[in-house]
Amino acid sequence: ADYIDEDVLAEFPEWYKEQTGEDIEVIYQVFDINEVMLTKIERGHEDFDVVCPSEYIIERMIRKDMLLPINRDFGNTPDYIPNLSPYIQDELNKMSQGDKKVTDYAVAYMWGTAGTLYNTEVVTEEEALECANLWNPKFNNKILMKDSYRDCYGLAIIYANKDRIEKGEVTVEQLMNDNSHESIAKAEEQLKLMKPNIAGWEADFGKEMMTKGKVWMNFTWSGDAVWAIEEAAEVGVELDYVVPIEGSNVWFDGWVIPKYARNVKAASY
């Protein structure tokens, strides 16, 4: 529910009518994880007009011909794509499928990292920086993991290959995109070993548990971490966030129009 400013949702119908002369109602729905949204569209043919999945889901939707190209020539609102960070633009371009450019199907919205949110009273920065400490028995039942397959898989496969990363034999990007049976088995093994330390798999309740001191570390997204740090500070709890020194996932979210959309015009706006 924190993903879009409520004022934007409230003001959009009025702005849309100014632009088009047409009335519209915004029905806003959120999903805990990307895969739930994808299943509703792919199998249930849900007629969402516009959705905002992460980069790996966008890539999959383009590959499966599930998206409509976006008409960028509309209204009086300038398209910000030409001013996009070169780094983000390069990363987005990697998701293109053959002659299908990702920028024809997606508009970048947010980006960030996956890392460790930690309580500075009980966890040092040095401990938070090392992936190995998420497996440390010292933190038995004191760690939350984001309920995200890609991020948990990434953490586990990076940790399993940390020596190879240090030697320069493999990159984090290569590991994140390796879905071989061997790599999946390695990640599964590491996640099983981590199980005694896991207090829960969270989609949205991590901020509350960290603020109340029920857990000490949360492997989460940078956006959620910032929100949690601000909320915790209001009640005198000091939290901080770091990206593991071994490396981690960089995520991108973007707006796309599913092919089952009923109001493509409004979705483009």
Model-derived features with residue positions:
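Alpha-to-beta junction loops
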Residues: 43-52, 66-68, 139-141, 212-220
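Extracytoplasmic/periplasmic substrate-recognition and gating elements
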Residues: 220, 224, 231-269
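Hinge/lid segment of periplasmic solute-binding proteins
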Residues: 38, 59-111, 125-130
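Hydrophobic residues within well-ordered alpha-helices
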Residues: 41, 209-211, 257
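Short helix-loop capping/hinge motifs at secondary-structure junctions, enriched
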Residues: 122-129, 161-168, 261-267
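Early extracytoplasmic/lumenal segment of secretory-pathway proteins
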Residues: 1-64
